[in-house]
């Protein structure tokens, strides 16, 4: 399954389970805490528009793009698209349509963990920072190395043919070494620190948005409203702990672009 097939199948409008809802509520809490509160905002991995519409309703001037045209068409077909400044189709690391320092905030949720090489990830960072104003906020979602390793481990354990299982375990060894599994890359906190030093970013937070909870999905769906609200509250309260952020499935990196001086 390539990325176009994957996102066609798992499009946001089809993802309404409580686990995804909990992740969205964590993301909302983090954006409310760290985004500037107003200004020009670029959502360069907008999916079908969930975050773009919410932020436009909060008063941001939002430009929304995605690399899958079906997603862009879904955004444009939504009546709320009238609240967006612009929509477009392009990858999050191809922002040549925008001038330098055009936005007060740039968010990219879902693209970084598909950039499987360091060079690709650095292009995404450089382009995002090019269009971001000094002191602006840059946010991207990540998947952790542990998520890559656990995902392939469970794949191996669910394989019942001897030869296939041996291949799966050898793939697991490579995933553990490279942090790459199929179309996904797991970014370490150390790489985030290196990127921040290299490109003049002040890290505001690194937070878990989605724990390693695949096998809990049915349990969470069956929760009472009271238990579910307690679960979400716990997710929000714990999300910025460094250990939780290191061992999550998905997380959110949020940083501020430094205003460079003569010594930088």
Language-model-detected regions and their locations in the chain:
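Conserved class I S-adenosyl-L-methionine
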Residues: 1-37, 50, 54, 138-167
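Class I SAM-dependent methyltransferase SAM/SAH-binding core
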Residues: 49-94
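A short glycine-rich, Lys/Arg-flanked "PGG" loop and its adjoining helix->strand segment in the class I
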Residues: 122-134
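Acceptor-substrate binding/catalytic loop of class I
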Residues: 115, 176-191
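A short acidic, Gly/Pro-enriched loop at the edge of an enzyme's catalytic core
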Residues: 96-106
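A short SAM/SAH-binding and catalytic strip from SAM-dependent methyltransferases
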Residues: 105-119
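A C-terminal cap/extension of S-adenosyl-L-methionine-dependent methyltransferases
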Residues: 205-264
